[in-house]
Amino acid sequence: MSFKSDNSNSILKNFKRTIIHPNGTNGEFNNNNNINNNNNNNNNNNNNNNNNNNNNSNNNLPIKRKVPESYSQYQYHQQKQVQKQNSQFHKESELNEMELDVEKEYYEQSKDIIGFKRFRSLDSNNNLNSNQFIENNQKSQFFNNNNNNNNNNNNSNNNKNFDQKDNEQEDIIKYMEFLSDIEQLNSDLKESKDNLESISIEMVLLETRLKGLLGLNTLRIIQNDQEQFLFKNKK
């Protein structure tokens, strides 16, 4: 059996196209797929390389950490805290001064020993507050120069408070001297009163003696009169 050349060529071509490839496709389609797959693989590899490069670049970036509070901010907060403590102390000292002024005026008018003891107890409480303020200043001396300046200002104010305390102590001493003078006057008055009582007693005794003497004189006069009367009657 013979084949025509045209038919034979077409059959061979068809046969060539229909060769079954081991992966289930024909050869030409498989080659195109392989080319496309290779291109896709190359693209994927390039993408992977780019991703790896990006990852490496990201890994080279510094790690973001929480920045700690700066020393200036720490100083600022500490300074605010010290100012708050100082303002609170000044408010308390002003209130204490107002109370002391009222108490002092009252007790200067009343001149009472009990009031003086009360005044002295208030003064001692104010001294305790000033000592507490000094202790707070000593605790804050390790801060910056601004705090040192604040401490210097506070120390100057504290010195003023101490001067005021000295003046108050002088007033207290004067008040004590005044009380001692009053006590001395009271003792002198009591002594003079005792002297007056003793003088009055002596006057009473003298009066009784005078009365007694007068009584004796009257008796003698009466007796003399009787004797003279009897003598005349005998004659």
From Swiss-Prot:
Region feature Disordered, mapped onto this chain: 20-64, 140-164
Keyword Coiled coil: yes
Coiled coil (UniProt feature): 174-213
Biased composition (Low complexity): 30-60, 140-161
Keyword Coiled coil: yes
The entry's keywords: Coiled coil
Protein name: Putative uncharacterized protein DDB_G0289009
